[in-house]
């Protein structure tokens, strides 16, 4: 007789845990207990789950695991940005980035090893697509970061959600803006985001979880029906010919379809605007005339713009827009009454800035020479 396969409980959201407990002959409330132990108390095994019946703990030992991906390296930038390189097996690695600010801490989470979209200005796409991450590998990034950050700040175990009312949560916002296109890994990303929102797990509000997409129109509609979180769209061009070149997915879902999908999404979104991300490329998409084209393109979509100075990498053949040109471009948008921000480049000395995530372990000597900046590197063993 063959034994049942072992289940990684990190792969299961609340509904999945209830179904799993039912398969063991257990009541639904056991699923909530398990979820709290795993996601709020960082339990690594079942022995310490003292409010579970011993018989259930014994069942779980033989049939389930709480398996996290391994950590290859842990780097801290001079500006406080922290990047983990995560081993997801078969020579694949993904990156997770924490960006601390005065009033919040934002975690940038990866959804795929590599990326098939292959945007011209993004180094991740240049490595090609390896595979989708599992739900465990996605939510595991938040679990790992939250408790690593708590430990580094001397915050004892306990609830990751700050449920004691003391506001102890370190990660206050999650952005699905790491490696990969989240909507092309929908079936793993959505359960992970459900866990991010679940009060028995991480308890984030829908306004504090943002999914960034290059514009997979049918899946935008599906997300709006299933789990509408805050939405960011990687726009980067005001016209189809230019966007076809910068974001090849545009050939399948052109701008007219994308703008219509944004309008539909706003009917159910937790925020009353879409964030359009726009990578500033010298002489490519940064003229004042193109800013006016953007205004015409998005006039029927309540939105804000996040202008992102391009972070160069050798294979791109592109150059970052000059600061004064970014300022002029932004002014055109702001003069029209559109909220516009220019993203401050963070973590570029550890290749953690926007567009730099490539999943490769780089030679740190050459990295330091190239950036002219120091990076604090913490070596950690796989867990």
Swiss-Prot record:
S-adenosyl-L-methionine binds at residues 180-181, 212, 234-236, 311. It is found in: Cytoplasm. One of its GO terms (cellular component) is cytoplasm. Residues 101-349 form the Radical SAM core domain. GO terms for molecular function: 4 iron, 4 sulfur cluster binding; metal ion binding; rRNA (adenine(2503)-C2-)-methyltransferase activity; rRNA binding; tRNA (adenine(37)-C2)-methyltransferase activity; tRNA binding. SUPFAM superfamilies: Radical SAM enzymes (SSF102114). The active site is at 95 (proton acceptor), 354 (s-methylcysteine intermediate). The keyword Acyltransferase does not apply. [4Fe-4S] cluster binds at residues 115, 119, 122. The keyword Lyase does not apply. It catalyses: adenosine(2503) in 23S rRNA + 2 reduced [2Fe-2S]-[ferredoxin] + 2 S-adenosyl-L-methionine = 2-methyladenosine(2503) in 23S rRNA + 5'-deoxyadenosine + L-methionine + 2 oxidized [2Fe-2S]-[ferredoxin] + S-adenosyl-L-homocysteine; adenosine(37) in tRNA + 2 reduced [2Fe-2S]-[ferredoxin] + 2 S-adenosyl-L-methionine = 2-methyladenosine(37) in tRNA + 5'-deoxyadenosine + L-methionine + 2 oxidized [2Fe-2S]-[ferredoxin] + S-adenosyl-L-homocysteine. Specifically methylates position 2 of adenine 2503 in 23S rRNA and position 2 of adenine 37 in tRNAs. m2A2503 modification seems to play a crucial role in the proofreading step occurring at the peptidyl transferase center and thus would serve to optimize ribosomal fidelity. Belongs to the radical SAM superfamily. RlmN family. Reaction proceeds by a ping-pong mechanism involving intermediate methylation of a conserved cysteine residue. NCBIfam families: rRNA_mod_RlmN. This is Dual-specificity RNA methyltransferase RlmN. It comes from Paraburkholderia phytofirmans (strain DSM 17436 / LMG 22146 / PsJN) (Burkholderia phytofirmans).
């Amino acid at each position: 007789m063959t034994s049942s396969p072992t289940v990684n409980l990190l792969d299961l959201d609340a509904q999945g845990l209830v179904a799993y407990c039912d398969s063991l002959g257990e009541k639904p409330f056991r699923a909530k207990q398990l979820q709290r132990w795993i996601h709020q108390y960082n339990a690594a095994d079942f022995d310490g789950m003292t409010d579970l019946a011993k018989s259930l703990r014994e069942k779980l030992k033989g049939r389930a695991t709480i398996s996290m991906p391994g950590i290859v390296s842990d780097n801290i930038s001079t500006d406080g940005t922290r990047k983990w390189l995560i081993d997801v097996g078969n020579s694949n690695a993904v990156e997770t980035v924490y960006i601390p600010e005065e009033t919040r801490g934002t975690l940038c989470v990866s959804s795929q090893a590599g990326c098939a979209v292959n945007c011209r200005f993004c180094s991740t796409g240049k490595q090609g697509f390896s595979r989708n991450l599992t739900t465990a590998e996605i939510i595991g990034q938040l679990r790992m970061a939250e408790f690593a950050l708590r430990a580094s700040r001397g915050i004892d175990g306990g609830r990751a959600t700050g449920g004691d009312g003391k506001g102890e949560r370190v990660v206050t916002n999650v952005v699905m803006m790491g490696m990969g296109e989240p909507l092309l890994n929908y079936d793993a990303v959505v359960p992970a985001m459900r866990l991010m929102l679940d009060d028995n797990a991480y308890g984030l509000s829908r306004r504090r979880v943002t999914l960034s997409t290059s514009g997979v129109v049918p899946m935008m509609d599906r997300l709006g029906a299933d789990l509408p979180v805050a939405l960011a769209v990687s726009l980067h061009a005001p016209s189809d010919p230019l966007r076809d070149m910068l974001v090849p997915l545009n050939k399948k879902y052109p701008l007219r379809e994308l703008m219509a999908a944004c309008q539909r999404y706003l009917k159910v979104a937790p925020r009353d605007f879409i964030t359009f991300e726009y990578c500033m490329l010298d002489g490519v998409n940064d003229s004042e005339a193109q800013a006016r084209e953007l205004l015409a393109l998005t006039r029927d979509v309540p939105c804000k713009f996040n202008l992102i100075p391009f972070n160069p990498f050798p294979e791109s053949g592109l150059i970052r827009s000059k600061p004064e040109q970014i300022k002029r471009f932004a002014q055109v948008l702001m003069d029209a009454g559109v909220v516009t921000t220019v993203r401050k480049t963070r973590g570029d000395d550890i290749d953690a800035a926007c567009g730099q995530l490539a999943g490769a372990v780089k030679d740190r000597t050459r990295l330091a020479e190239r950036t002219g900046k120091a990076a604090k590197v913490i070596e950690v063993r796989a867990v």
